[in-house]
């Protein structure tokens, strides 16, 4: 059995439930028999001690995702390499979808040597691999330096729109959410990267789900390396926690999981729209997400009870970016113009992460379309939190605002929400 990860320091803070925001929200928690009620889920301060990008936007704050450093002030962008994917059926074909960010990992030596499908790269010290899900239904593995395939792709059977996620302990364990039902049942598929075997399948057509007819997983989950658990939202309207029971032996070249499942099911009385497309944010024992009806929630992962809820006004697919550098942790979020469309406003907000209090709102007019096909507008991209020289700014990218031929990158003042510049 592989040695346990190094000790991790949990994040502690004071936060109390806001019952006035929860009067119209009902919930239930469905647990497999082996998962105790008191199973404590607290994310450590450091998501991973391995060099890489292991989930969408890098980790629980959904505010990173970069790998490496720019050595000097760049004056131009240069295309270094490209990789051509295969193609699935129309209309998805190939390439990447929303969100489509790759995972990147500098494999630790013991992990690299445990994966024979890497071939000669098992002996390449410092090897960095790019792992990309595609609309062609495959997961592609590329050498970061050359862009050449580093091992054979994994064929999942369905187009992948979201971002794959890797085990932040450095274990060769890959989580792939499928976006479109095409050839096989749709859901979350878990693969070991020793022999590329599927070790677990979480079906999207869950009999406990409020939205059983759509089982996609565009969300990129979070793995708690301390508790060996994985949390992810489904478009079927459920929030899942998987207690993995991971068994990895790099000497025997074996990796197995035996997940037990916790399901968080909820209903907001004012909404008939279910489904989580964004990737959950987390701070210690608090998790944050939004749904297709615009309900933004904070839940206590230790008990799976909601702490607060907020009605954003419309579908919220962009992940909630969490800024922990402020005196109090804040969430930056925004909604689309979808159910309120085709003409309406995208509302960009800063929310106190501990209370759900809206600290500012800045709204921008947008225009979607109903014909010849429905097209939504507003915020789809996850906000980017400024650091360093731009630590006072937060960046939003909005679509079809104010009209169908327009879009903008907005820099807003973190403290006030005022527009500083746009492009």
Residue ranges and their predicted role:
Residues 2-42, 48, 56, 63-217, ...:
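Extracytoplasmic/lumenal domain signature
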């Amino acid at each position: 059995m592989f040695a346990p990860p190094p000790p991790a320091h949990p994040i502690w803070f004071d936060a109390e439930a806001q019952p006035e925001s929860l009067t119209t929200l009902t919930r239930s928690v469905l647990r497999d028999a082996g998962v105790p009620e008191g199973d404590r889920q607290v994310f450590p301060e450091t998501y991973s001690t391995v060099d890489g990008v292991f989930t969408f936007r890098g980790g629980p704050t959904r505010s990173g995702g970069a790998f490496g450093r720019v050595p000097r002030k760049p004056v131009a962008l240069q295309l270094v390499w490209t990789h051509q994917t295969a193609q699935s059926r129309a209309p998805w074909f190939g390439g990447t979808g929303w969100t489509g960010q790759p995972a990147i990992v500098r494999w630790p030596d013991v992990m690299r040597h445990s994966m024979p499908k890497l071939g000669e790269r098992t002996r390449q010290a410092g090897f960095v691999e790019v792992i990309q899900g595609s609309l062609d239904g495959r997961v592609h593995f590329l050498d970061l330096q050359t862009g050449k395939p580093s091992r054979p792709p994994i064929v999942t059977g369905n187009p992948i729109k979201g971002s794959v996620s890797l085990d932040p302990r450095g274990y060769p364990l890959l989580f792939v959410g499928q976006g479109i039902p095409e050839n096989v049942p749709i859901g979350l598929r878990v693969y070991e990267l020793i022999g590329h075997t599927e070790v677990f399948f979480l079906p999207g057509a869950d009999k406990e789900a409020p939205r059983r007819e759509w089982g996609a997983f565009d969300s990129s989950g979070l793995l708690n390396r301390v508790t060996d658990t994985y949390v992810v939202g489904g478009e079927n309207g459920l929030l899942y926690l998987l207690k993995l029971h991971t068994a990895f032996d790099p000497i025997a070249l074996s990796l197995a999981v035996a997940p037990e499942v916790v399901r968080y099911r909820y209903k907001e009385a004012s909404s008939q729209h279910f489904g989580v497309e964004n990737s959950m944010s987390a701070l210690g024992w608090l998790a944050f997400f939004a749904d297709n009806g615009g309900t933004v929630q904070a839940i206590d992962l230790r008990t799976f009870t909601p702490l607060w809820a907020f009605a954003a006004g419309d579908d919220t697919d962009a992940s909630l970016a969490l800024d922990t550098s402020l005196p109090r942790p804040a969430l930056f979020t925004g909604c689309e113009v979808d159910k309120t469309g085709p003409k309406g406003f995208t509302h960009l907000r800063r929310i106190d992460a501990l209370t759900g209090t809206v600290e500012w709102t800045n709204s921008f007019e947008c225009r979607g379309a109903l014909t010849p096909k429905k097209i939504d507008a507003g915020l789809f991209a996850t906000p980017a939190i400024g650091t360093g020289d731009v630590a006072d700014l937060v960046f939003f990218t909005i679509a079809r605002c104010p009209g169908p031929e327009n879009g903008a990158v907005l820099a807003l003042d973190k403290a006030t929400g005022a527009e500083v510049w746009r492009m």
